Regions:
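Cyclophilin-like peptidyl-prolyl cis-trans isomerases
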Residues: 1-167
Length: 167
């Protein structure tokens, strides 16, 4: 089953395909957070040209590095779903940001270029279908010494697109 979400950002829309069957726990967490409006107002808080842009922190605190999940675990994090077939092999790969093994929450990133050094370390759960021009704009943003965009760019909202081929 293909599931599509559209990130409506302050720079334009990015349509994503989420790999529900390949990484069900990661997909369920992402989709549930989208449905609960968790990502609304979430800033793109880390940007490294030729690498990636990261988002998914709570909108209430733009400087927060916090993360949340739908899973009732002691640390509010969940395990990796590393799949050898899902790789960081192109621009527009959507993957979980983490702080090490089995430390996934709400934060994720979109690659600007292949990042094979992340294969086996970060869970790939989707890819960009449309909106590469928005990625182009994001990648050109000026950043500070800590790789934070100097201009505020955020996810305004997320919408679902039904798959007309689903049964």
């Amino acid at each position: 089953m293909l599931t599509r979400r559209q990130l409506h950002t302050s720079r334009g829309d990015i349509k994503l395909e989420v790999f529900c069957e390949s990484v069900p726990k990661t997909a369920e967490n992402f989709l549930a957070l989208c449905a609960s409006d968790y990502y609304n107002g979430s800033p793109f808080h880390r940007l490294i040209p030729n690498f990636m842009v990261q988002t998914g922190s709570p909108a209430s605190d733009p400087k927060s590095k916090a993360s949340a999940t739908i899973y009732d675990t002691p640390n509010q994090l969940f395990e990796d779903e590393i799949r050898p077939a899902l790789r960081h092999n192109s621009r527009g790969i959507v993957s979980m940001a983490n702080k090490g093994v089995n430390s996934n929450g709400s934060q994720f990133f979109i690659t600007f270029a292949p990042a094979p050094h992340l294969d086996g370390k970060n869970t790939v759960f989707g890819k960009v279908l449309e909106g590469t021009e928005v990625l182009d704009e994001l990648e050109k943003l000026e950043v500070d010494k800590k790789s934070r965009p100097k201009e505020k760019v955020e996810i305004k909202s997320v919408t679902m697109h039904a798959n007309p081929l689903a049964g």
